[in-house]
């Protein structure tokens, strides 16, 4: 057992021009979760994002979608975590993952940023603490490192987008276990699905 998740952060870029792009897979996850639970996200400028509180497995969980650009996500995460006294190891950051194919989602505890600017900024904002959980939503890789920036900022074709949504749905089913602190069960369910 590990510390239970009490804050879920969905990474993305603000603005309609970035809506439903591959890079916003984390943001889409949190927005869909809030919508499914009937809890609208509210613009909360003091925390640099849209926030709400949900109940999962009888526990309060804070949701956050930063209104900062991806590379400044740490400002929002640190603000909300500090305000509610949420330790880094109680945070789950949901983000796009180039190294996983569309249709795949993986959980991970701690580690580096892997070149992801949102994770890099969160690690720095949390005092170089890397022990937060990550839900990695696969978006695939364009095959050429020089194409990554344009690739992640584009919308996925419809068939690929459906695969990303399927992975998000599978990941959502693990949240009750994560809130209970049962990362092993959540990983087993998600990684063998």
Curated annotation (Swiss-Prot):
Q: Kindly list the biological process annotations in GO that this record carries.
A: protein quality control for misfolded or incompletely synthesized proteins; rescue of stalled ribosome
Q: What's one GO-annotated cellular component?
A: cytoplasm
- Please state where this protein is localized: Cytoplasm
Which EC main class describes this enzyme?
hydrolase
Specify whether Protein transport is a keyword of the entry: no
RNA-binding recorded as keyword: yes
Site Discriminates between blocked and unblocked aminoacyl-tRNA — annotated at: 13
The active-site annotation reads 23 (proton acceptor)
**UniProt keyword list:** Cytoplasm, Hydrolase, RNA-binding, tRNA-binding
Disulfide pairs?
Answer: none
Major location (coarse): cytoplasm
- Give one Pfam hit by family name: Pept_tRNA_hydro
The record, for InterPro entries, names: Pept_tRNA_hydro, Pept_tRNA_hydro_CS, Pept_tRNA_hydro_sf
* Residues flagged as site, Stabilizes the basic form of H active site to accept a proton: 96
Query: Which reactions does this protein catalyse?
Result: an N-acyl-L-alpha-aminoacyl-tRNA + H2O = an N-acyl-L-amino acid + a tRNA + H(+)
Q: Report the GO molecular function annotations.
A: peptidyl-tRNA hydrolase activity; tRNA binding
Which HAMAP family did the record assign?
Answer: Pept_tRNA_hydro_bact (MF_00083)
Function recorded in the entry:
Hydrolyzes ribosome-free peptidyl-tRNAs (with 1 or more amino acids incorporated), which drop off the ribosome during protein synthesis, or as a result of ribosome stalling. Catalyzes the release of premature peptidyl moieties from peptidyl-tRNA molecules trapped in stalled 50S ribosomal subunits, and thus maintains levels of free tRNAs and 50S ribosomes.
Q: How does it assemble?
A: Monomer.
Return the NCBIfam families for the record.
pth
Similarity remark: Belongs to the PTH family.
The name this protein carries in UniProt is Peptidyl-tRNA hydrolase
Organism source for this protein?
Teredinibacter turnerae (strain ATCC 39867 / T7901)
Q: Which gene encodes it?
A: pth
């Amino acid at each position: 057992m590990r510390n239970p998740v009490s804050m879920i952060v969905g990474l993305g870029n603000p603005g309609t021009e970035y809506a439903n792009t591959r890079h916003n897979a984390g943001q889409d996850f949190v927005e869909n979760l809030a919508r499914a639970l009937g809890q609208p996200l509210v613009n909360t400028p003091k925390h640099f994002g849209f926030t709400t509180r949900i109940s999962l497995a009888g526990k309060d969980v804070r949701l956050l979608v930063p209104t900062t650009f991806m590379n400044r996500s740490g400002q929002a995460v640190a603000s909300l975590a500090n305000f509610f006294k949420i330790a880094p190891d109680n945070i789950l950051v949901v983000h796009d993952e180039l190294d996983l194919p569309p249709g795949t989602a993986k959980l991970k505890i701690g580690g580096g940023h892997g070149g992801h600017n949102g994770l890099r900024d969160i690690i720095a904002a949390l005092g170089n603490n890397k022990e937060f959980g990550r839900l990695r939503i696969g978006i695939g890789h364009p095959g050429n490192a020089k194409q990554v920036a344009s690739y992640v900022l584009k919308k996925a074709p419809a068939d690929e987008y459906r695969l990303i949504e399927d992975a998000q749905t599978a990941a959502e089913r693990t949240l009750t276990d994560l809130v209970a602190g049962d990362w092993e069960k959540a990983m087993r369910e998600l990684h063998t699905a």
